From Swiss-Prot:
Protein family membership: Belongs to the [NiFe]/[NiFeSe] hydrogenase large subunit family.
Binding site for Ni(2+): 76, 79, 576, 579
InterPro entries, per database record: Ni-dep_hyd_lsu, Ni-dep_hyd_lsu_Ni_BS, NiFe-Hase_large, NiFe/NiFeSe_hydrgnase_LSU
Subunit organization: Heterodimer of a large and a small subunit.
Molecular function via GO: ferredoxin hydrogenase activity; hydrogenase (acceptor) activity; nickel cation binding
Entries under Gene3D superfamilies matching the protein: Cytochrome-c3 Hydrogenase, chain B
Entry superkingdom: Bacteria
PANTHER family: HYDROGENASE-1 LARGE CHAIN, HYDROGENASE-2 LARGE CHAIN
Name of the molecule in the record: Hydrogenase-1 large chain
Length: 597
């Protein structure tokens, strides 16, 4: 039955042809997307569905709070470590543990490293092939490609011979008939706008980034012992410091610290001379995408803030990445966010496969309930083989978080807009420079293209903070301050019988919060609201759509059976994609299989 209604400035209408994209994998599992298109192939309805139940919040009940970080870290293997960071913050907040300055600095180094790594991997490996036509690169003139690259930056790997070699490697790959990960791309799609030379340059940098990302993450192995899933500890960091070779064997020494500095220098070089110029090149060829995929970004955005410069201080004066919330498009009024305020953050489940005592009411995470209740309702197909979801009923394993009743967008774009409108000088300078180079207004950031540009902006910001915190660490070490952990309250006997705490930070993909309640030295309630929960949110009792759903509204598809436009916008949020996708017609028959990168 068709349904039409108004919400958040959009007319949602599920009449017309239905396309199903399933699965699209993301951080916590797999994601499904369904859209309706009208006679002009314009999306009039979008449905975002999380198709995998997580359950870690249930697993944590009754466990030792000091172990929580090791469990929740496994929520995601891509933005690895960030859930552990939020977890140790939450447990320390509950118990009342103060960490040493070095522990705070090293945690910020770990987070800044993750931002640099994740933004590079997203830009090239996950979203890049939505903009770079690999096969078109075979038509490029390597000499012209070299001239283009050298006009953009002083990156040394830009000679005609270098691009000739890359093109030759690609040609052999294609001629062999084994395209591998590039096999199911929509090469030649009319939305690919880069010149052959820009495509060859982008493909070459794709290969370089694939190799270089392995180097960046070595910083995690220095301070966390391994990657993915580095080690953390409630009360600080588990790495001892031994700069004069007199301490513990295996501790962080000057050789490893020099390695960290070398990686930071090379990371800054790659971001400034490869990633940022590539992002601007994509922008130059794709300016219409500065008006596509706006979604909630011009209405409601949210950031918790991150990178406390002062140990144990999460106030606005300490956070180098500002936090705040904007609703109803009023960017002149960036409101403070309090994660303990039960009227601010609430999660709804009336369109999710969970159950509350009253499904029409939202619940603050401290009062959160994770009770799965799979009840797809009246769908096309069967409960185990759904051909088409019914968004008027329950349709996702993702709850619907709301801030003061509003659906919000989180992530790099949200953070950038909030920092910009709070007057952060570095953000204003960077954003204005980018938009001036592209001859686009600031509103052009509120788009699919804008999310891509914000990744480049944030990568530059993060690597500058990586150097900043490393310099702070080295100053402390030179002054004889080697402490990395506070174990005064390690033993449960020193804890209150009942306590609760909140840990928050900004994952590369957006606002991340953990809420922990402890009773009798064991976890009583543990709730996570992750970035994808916000962005991939289903509808709520008011019919408000989530950020993914809103961003797809109004998008015109050139070739519905080749939904590059859908993938571009979804990838701009970075739901951590890796699997093959199937596009289904409204009768349930498969139209085409695509590789989602």
């Amino acid at each position: 039955m068709s349904n039409s209604y108004q919400t958040q400035g959009y007319t949602v209408n599920n009449a017309g042809r239905r396309l199903v994209v399933d699965p699209i994998t993301r951080i916590e599992g797999h994601m499904r997307c369904e859209v309706n298109i009208d006679e002009q192939n314009i999306i009039t309805n979008a449905v975002s569905c999380g198709t995998m139940f997580r359950g870690l919040e249930i697993i944590l009940q009754g466990r030792d709070p000091r172990d929580a970080w090791a469990f929740v870290e496994r929520i995601c293997g891509v933005c690895t470590g960030v859930h552990a960071l939020a977890s140790v913050y939450a447990i320390e907040d509950a118990i009342g543990i103060k960490v040493p300055d070095n522990a705070n600095i090293i945690r910020n180094i770990m987070l800044a490293t993750l931002w640099c790594h994740d933004h590079l991997v997203h830009f090239y490996q996950l979203a890049g092939m939505d903009w770079i036509d690999v096969l078109n690169a075979l038509k490029a003139d390597p000499r012209a490609t070299s001239q283009l690259a050298q006009s953009l930056s002083a990156w040394p790997m830009s000679s005609p011979g270098y691009f000739f070699d890359v093109q030759n490697r690609l040609k052999k790959f294609v001629d062999g008939g084994q395209l591998g990960i590039f096999r199911n791309g929509y090469w030649g799609h009319p939305q690919y706008k880069l010149s052959p030379e820009a495509n060859l340059m982008g493909f070459a940098h794709y290969l370089e980034a694939l190799d270089f990302q392995r180097e960046i993450i070595k910083i995690h192995t220095v301070f966390g012992g391994k990657n993915p899933h580095p080690n953390w500890i409630v009360g600080g960091m588990p790495c001892a410091i031994n700069i004069d070779q007199s301490g513990a064997v295996g501790a962080v020494d000057m050789e490893r610290l020099n390695l960290v500095q070398s990686i930071i220098t090379r990371t800054a070089d790659f971001i400034n001379n490869v990633m940022v110029p590539d992002a601007l090149a994509i922008g130059q060829f794709n300016k219409p995408w500065s008006q596509i995929g706006t979604g909630l970004s011009d209405k409601c955005v949210l950031s918790y803030g991150a990178f406390p410069d002062i140990a144990n201080d999460f106030s606005a004066k300490s956070l180098l990445m500002p936090g705040g919330a904007v609703i109803n498009g009023d960017f002149n009024n960036v409101m403070p966010v309090d994660l303990a305020d039960q009227q601010q953050i609430q999660e709804f489940v009336d369109h999710a496969w969970y159950r509350y005592p009253d499904d029409q009411l939202g619940r603050h995470p401290f009062e959160g309930i994770t009770e799965p209740w799979y009840n797809p309702g009246d769908v096309k197909g069967s409960d185990t083989d759904i051909q088409q979801l019914n968004e008027q009923e329950r349709y996702s394993w993702i709850k619907a978080p709301r801030w003061r009743g509003h659906a919000m967008e989180v992530g790099p774009l949200a953070r950038t807009l909030i920092a910009y409108h709070k007057g952060d000088a570095a953000t204003i300078e960077s954003v204005d420079r980018m938009m001036s180079a592209l001859k686009l207004p600031l509103s052009g950031m509120q788009s699919t293209l804008g999310r891509i540009l914000c990744r480049a902006h944030e990568a530059q910001w993060a690597v500058s903070k990586l150097q900043y915190f490393f310099d702070k660490l080295m100053t402390n070490l030179k002054n004889g301050n080697l402490a990395t952990a506070n174990t005064e309250k390690w033993e449960p006997a020193s804890w209150p019988q009942q306590c609760r705490g909140i840990g928050f930070t900004e994952a590369p993909r957006g606002a991340l919060g953990h809420w922990a309640s402890i009773r009798d030295q064991k976890i009583d309630v543990y709730q996570c609201v992750v970035p994808t929960t916000w962005n991939a949110s289903p509808r709520d009792p008011e019919g408000q759509i989530g950020a993914y759903e809103a961003a797809l509204m109004g998008t015109q598809m050139a070739i519905p059976d080749q939904p590059l436009e859908i993938l571009r916008t979804l990838h701009s949020f970075d739901p951590c994609l890796a699997c093959s996708t199937h596009v289904l017609g409204d009768d349930g028959s498969e139209l085409i299989a695509v590789q989602v990168r």
